[in-house]
Amino acid sequence: MTKQVLIINVTRMGDLIQTGPLLSRLRDEWPDVAIDLVVDRSFAPTAALLTGLRQIISCDFTGLLDECRMQSKSLVTLMQGMTAWAAPLRAARYDRIINLTFNRQTGLLASYIGAPDLRGIIAGPDGCPIVQDPWLSYFTDLHRHRRFNRFNLVDLYAMGGSGTGAFSPLSITIPADGRAWADLFLQSQGRTVRQWIAVQAGASDVMKAWRPEYFGQTMARLSRHSGVGFVMIGTAAEADAI
């Protein structure tokens, strides 16, 4: 019988890209595995670039958190809405759930959906978050010992979500229309640029982002080299920083 895995990874665009080797590792573990991915609605286009997914399940988690903060709806109403949204996932009867979004809310979601094998943050018996799996427990303490860490985030995801296996590089699949648009855009900017550098000035949390002036200073230094051009990338929410 085909194994089913649900990955919850809702908050960061970069983390989605770094999920690629985990997808490959899961296919090594179970060649016929069906993998579903839960993401924030704003990151669904990024998730579509990953290979090996059965389906991408999106939700406006950002809007949901805003409603919680502003108390525009009662907690009971919000919980009823989320349980209704998650009902099909609960009915899917996943074999494994891997929660790579390390906060209490997604821990509650993972535990509500349920699976025989839960990894990452889940809700404990008293509702408080606990971390399942030694590799993902290590990840949650990483900020305390960064100087001593020798593991890449990609490897922690792959080891925690699956286990040991063959090396798999980061990779995404660029659709033909996206590649054609990029070629046309870059060609329209002139032929003096020999090396393009993509700059993402935003972050999932403004407190984690560089100040815009630091990006400006870095780009100014890099621009001293001839033939260098810059492309600012990001989401609509990061437009002010750009």
Question: Which stretches of residues belong to each language-model region?
Answer:
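Catalytic machinery of carbohydrate-active enzymes
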Residues: 1-242
